[in-house]
Amino acid sequence: YKRQVYEREGAGYFLKNFADFFAEDDLTVVNLEGVLTDNNALYPRDKGKGDDGYWFRGPAAYAKVLSAASVEVASLANNHAFDYGAQGFRDTIAAVEAEGLGWFGTYNKNRDPETEKFYFYTKDGVTICLMSLLWDDYNPQDPNGNGAYLRQQITEIKQSGQADAVIAILHGGQEYGRHRTKPQTIFTKMAISAGADLVICHHAHVVMGMDVINNRSAFYSLGNFCFGGNRKAYQENKNRTPAVQDAAPALMLRAVLTFDDDGTYEGQQITLYPVQTTGIDRAAGDTVQVNNYQPKFITGPLAAHVLHLSLIHI
């Protein structure tokens, strides 16, 4: 169905409500969660879940959805980047680069070296490094040593002078959970102690709380944004634990980092914008909200509710 919408409406349809907003900033960054490939010979990677797993893919042309809306960079460190194996990942990189977008991400420190990449952005003599990492939230012992690897990379980048500020995007947590997990807390504190100036987490699909650590902001989940995984943006499901009830509302974050004349980092100003993943509102009493794949800004009581969720520190 998403492909029908793409063919009927064009690439500019999906992020139409944000294109002008994104064009105002220096850099728009998204978490691209899925495989973009035209290779029909690729098969879904075995996730050990039988038919219960989720595999996300779309044609390479879907990268135009990002470029059409002034998105400049995509993080590829997430649990769906390898849904169709290493070749699917490489095809995604090719699709993104063909649209002039940058990308970054470390899927796992033991993966193919080509999957490790940081993104450096320089303006007015100041350089910001974007890095992202996926970890196994179901194995908090971190057998792959990703935590130590993350700390090492941030420390090296800051101490070597490669970047004046580091933004770490971490992928992990409990899907549809309202509270941060222990590994989330550990990895976030580890990143900031190593020198990260801003930490943003993804994976939960719903809005979680935030924290301030050593004058650095940490956001544990912004929720979904333009999400094609479900035809229904909201469907009350009391049989699932936790119940899926607030997957439509989400947050978009704008960060303004300030530096002195010598390029020394001075501070940050964070603005949160309440959004929802669909342009179709849910009427009072409805247990289903249709997803038209066109997120929009929201205001009023729902926006206030979403902002309240971001203030939960538990």
What are these model-derived regions, one by one?
Residues K2-L311:
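Acidic, metal/ion-coordinating pockets
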